[in-house]
Design a protein with these regions (language model features):
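Short hydrophobic/aromatic-enriched beta-strand-loop microsegments
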Residues: 22, 114-123, 186-191
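Metallo-beta-lactamase
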Residues: 94-161, 241-263
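Active-site neighborhood of phospho(di)ester-bond hydrolases with catalytic His/Asp-centered motifs
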Residues: 21-23, 60-77, 99-102, 164-170, ...
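Extreme N-terminal starter segment of soluble prokaryotic enzymes
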Residues: 1-3
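Active-site environment of divalent metal-dependent phosphoester hydrolases
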Residues: 27-29, 69-83, 105-108, 123-126, ...
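Catalytic core of the metallo-beta-lactamase
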Residues: 5-18, 126-186
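Cap/insert and terminal regions of metallo-dependent hydrolase folds
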Residues: 41, 46, 99, 171-257
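Pre-active-site segment of Zn-dependent metallo-hydrolases
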Residues: 18-89, 142, 172-182
């Protein structure tokens, strides 16, 4: 298995002939509005372009997983950092089959995407000769997660590959801990940018939560969702310092945009 990190939460899993695109934010730098104006410096998103190897990888994509997309079915509130207009256009143009939560299936189909599978939490479903399980995610602490319309993570078991748990946009919850302890993924992916809007509590794990997630992870951890969005204050350097302080750095990969990891 290879993990090709593109930008923020967008990456590609390569497994044999299959190239699985995760959460396609594919637009050029500055094509989305700022996600924070007062708490953090206002800047249009994404704050960086896709890496130079992105188009070659995207040309190979065969499937797509979307952890979350819609908020109450209202298009202007779509989570553009996980599915933007360029991502939609790509999926539609190339007829890429999408797997997402059942509650998001009709929304994506309404806008022209082909949803192959709608998943229910904790129910294992056949996927590419293996299995996929949706794990509930809580997109923030306090009341804000209800406004954010929670998505999910994905636990993937593909033939002759290490298992992988993509935790998605979530804080540390009993469901996340259950996934780590019961499913025992060989690889885990955690969003560590600590996104926060101008109102409400953080939308992703705090540093302490991320460190605990990493401790609980049975195998290697990949950290993402950093250095591409103006409401994510934690960068790679800051994360490395935290990991070093907790003696966890060797357990974690922090890929640069365009970098590939082999497992």
């Amino acid at each position: 298995m290879k993990i090709h990190h593109l930008r923020s939460a967008t990456f590609v899993i390569e497994s044999g002939k299959h190239f699985i695109l995760i959460d396609p934010m594919l637009g050029d730098q500055g094509t989305l509005p700022p996600f924070s104006v007062f708490r953090f410096k206002a800047a249009k998103n994404p704050t960086v372009d896709l890496p130079s190897n992105a188009q070659d990888l995207l040309a190979k994509v065969t499937h797509c997983l979307v952890t979350h997309s819609q908020t109450f079915g209202f298009k202007p509130l779509q989570h553009g950092d996980h599915l933007d207009s360029a991502g939609e256009e790509f999926l539609i143009k190339h007829s890429i089959p999408v797997t997402t939560l059942t509650k998001d299936k009709a929304y994506l189909e309404k806008y022209g995407m082909s949803v192959e599978s709608g998943l229910e939490p904790w129910i294992s479903t056949e996927f590419l000769g293996g299995n996929i399980t949706a794990v509930p995610a809580q997109h923030g602490h306090g009341w804000i997660h209800k406004v954010m319309a929670n998505g999910c993570g994905f636990f993937l078991e593909l033939p002759n590959e290490p298992s992988i748990y993509i935790s998605g946009d979530t804080v540390l919850t009993a469901d996340v801990e259950r996934a780590l302890s019961e499913l025992k993924p060989d690889i885990t992916v955690v969003a560590t940018g600590q996104a926060q809007m101008d109102v409400g509590q953080p939308l992703l794990m705090s540093t302490n939560e991320a460190m605990e997630f990493i401790r609980l992870s049975p195998g290697k951890v990949i950290a993402n969702h950093m250095e591409a969005l103006n409401h994510c204050p934690v960068d790679r350097t800051t994360l490395k310092r935290s990991l070093e302080a907790q003696n966890l750095l060797e357990k974690v990969s922090i890929p640069e945009d365009g970098e590939s990891l082999t497992f």
